[in-house]
Amino acid sequence: MRYQLTPIYCRPWLLNGLSQRLIESHYENNYGGALRRLNSITQQLESLDFAATPGYVLNGLKRDELIALNSTLLHELYFASLGGEGRDPKPFADVLARDFGSLDRWKSEFVAMGNALAGGSGWVLLVYVPRDRRLINQYAADHSQTLAGGIPILALDMYEHAYHIDFGANAVAYVDAFMRNIDWSGVRSRYDDAARVEPPRPLLQKEFDDIPGVSPEEVKAMLDAGKPVQIIDARPKHYFSRTQDIMAGAVWRDPERVQDWVGELSRSDPVVVFCVYGFHVGCQTAGALREAGLDAVYTKGGHSAWKAIGGPTQLHA
């Protein structure tokens, strides 16, 4: 067998409001069933002649493998999430407050998401996202829906098998019982491990490392805050003449004639330059302005990125 069973972590007889019978049934039948199904699928895949296997057969097996593997992993996290006293996680409250505004707001959203799945099925997951170095509450309608790149650290199983033995259709009472049994020390340990995972490496234009750039979100934040900033559209003339829109508040200037218009700019306010995609033209224009003594930066991703975030544009003459 390729995948080994993980012994149950929590002590079923000590849980508050969740019966030993419920936990045993859930662990043995649903978690165990997922693991057995996963190993059966794995065995089938290992024996396949991929070159001779019809595409629909391979697709079906890989789909079933994804569902069974995620079900196995999420159930292991679910049982690892139980066994505590469910008290407010003082050592972890600062992290939840940082990412959700407050501990109460995190709890309110997590519980509401569980209650919203009552009568249906799915998962509510507390997930760490290395890309943004933050936690989010994730909804999953089934075992195949998990956040790409996310690391789950707490799992609430909202499939009926997780509560019907004790609670029948009263999923709200089940969610309350789950919250009373969270092992926060385990959640914190998993968070600490997840937080050590580095975010994806940014793709850098190394030839422009010496020129500072800002994201379109940072540009929008400056404008929304009313900060004085000079926005220069430096898209090449031949490109600009074929387009209709320009970033709201920007003025177009020919990037090939910087010396002709640099004197128009205020030396007391920062300058943000953008071209089409944030490559050579924008960077070189920002570099020329910096050489002239201006506080200039280029916009990462250029005009295309500005439109992608929904930044306001207007028609140009």
Predicted regions mapped to residue ranges:
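Feature for soluble, non-membrane regions of globular proteins
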Residues: 1-202
